[in-house]
Amino acid sequence: MKKIKEKDKMEILPVKSLMLRMGVPMILSMVLQAVYNIVDSAFVSNMEDNGELALNALTLAFPLQMLIVAIGIGTGVGVNVLVSKSLGEGNGNYADKAAGNGVFLAVVIYAAFLIFGLFGVKLYIGTQTANGIVLEMACDYLRICCVYSFGLVFFSLYEKLLQATGKSVFSTIAQICGAVANIILDPIMIYGLLGCTKFGVKGAAYATVIGQIISLAVAFIFHVKFNKDITNNVKNIKPAANTILNIYKIGLPAIIAQALMSVMTYGFNLILGTVSEAMVTAYGLYYKIQQFILFAAFGLRDAITPIMSYAFGMKSKKRIDDSIKFGSIYTTVIMFVGLAVIEIIANPLSSAFGLSGETQLLCIGAMRIVSASFIFAGINIAFQGMFQAINGGMQSLIVSVCRQLVLVLPLAWIFTVLVNKSICGEWIIWLSVPVAEILSAVISVVLMKKLYQKQINNKTEA
């Protein structure tokens, strides 16, 4: 059996400080991931020709981009938890097998999106718009993102492997390298600066995938050089049905949870399209702006999950309790700060994009109303990570389905009907998000109490 250190920081550091130590780099990493989406939008919206149409095109492409992220990160979460739990149990050989099978799955995932990028993009975009200019720009952008998506898919894996062993600072450095490259390349490739060809919307896509490939390269180097808890062996890449099943027992709810963001965004695009094209553009921009806050909660969740999973493997009730306590406190603080920031800077932030007066007002209204849901959204996100850590994948899935599908889209549709009948103003549509998050938070708390009794009280030691 592979030799495992008896004591390491995942086992002996107080959860209160360990969560900050691991969480801060992960938060930064996730916020930087949001940079990819918002930076592209900022630059294309200020293009000389058709800036607002270009922003609309990116909004239509966004659900599929999020699906790539969902499957990549969800698979990574499954590998992350399995590796972390195996190391906590002292089973290093199985941790190696889980990591190797993660590589195999990343190859399969990339192949699927490569095929979609070559043959399925136009059909998908065509379901959301009849505007020829928007259709062409959205297809150009999304095709590039899919064909070169190997950077995003494989980075998601190596990022989670670094996080699984407590080396989240390295994954953050890799994310920073890609984000900086993206920010630098965006204006150069979109506007044709420094002698570069003026690519327009295509330039935004090229800058994005180049940044992702750079992040992958750096993360892979860090993994090979510093992730000594995991042995990299080609034989571990050979697919093992049982290992893959275990990865997706954990990861599938995470994939569905992330994919539901795609479904929700796609659904909102269709629903809001019955009101006006400006509503779709405003929604797309507000959604990317709010990701800076929500992704911070996702980052902390990604620290909560391996810490709590490791404690679950140790059967340490105290460390599990501390994970729940401090995970909830830290997440609430993050979301409260995010709420305050959005309320204060909604106006100047939206003005950074080349929007018409109507679209900007709609975007400001969306930000101010939806930000009221941040505290409850944070509770839901944190609890989803906790559920995953203690074999509560189904509970995590239930919360995701409630907050991003079952509750929010029917409410949005009902409110849109009221708007189209001139019974209410457009602002009421945004209320669907806070209402859905509040109801989902109640469901989260109830499910946690039941799962805690089953998994923690009966199966762990003090």
What are these regions (language model features)?
Residues M1-G23, V83-F150, T197-L252, M308-S373, ...:
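Short alpha-helical transmembrane segments in multi-pass integral membrane proteins
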Residues M10-A42, N46-N50, P63-G78, L82, ...:
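N-terminal transmembrane alpha-helices
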Residues R21-D40, I144, G178, G211-S215, ...:
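Transmembrane helical elements of multi-pass membrane transporters/channels
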Residues M26, M30, A42, V81, ...:
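Transmembrane alpha-helix boundary and packing residues in multipass membrane permease domains
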Residues V31, V35-N56, I125-G132, I188-F199, ...:
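Helix-terminus/linker motif at the lipid-water interface of multi-pass membrane proteins
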Residues E52-P63, L142, A205, E277-F292, ...:
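Small-residue hotspots at the loop-to-helix junctions and early N-terminal turns
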Residues L55-I115, L152-S171, A282-A346, A377-V399:
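Small-residue-rich hydrophobic transmembrane alpha-helices
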Residues G76, C145-Q163, S171-A179, A204-A219, ...:
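Short runs within selected transmembrane alpha-helices of multi-pass transporters and secretion channels
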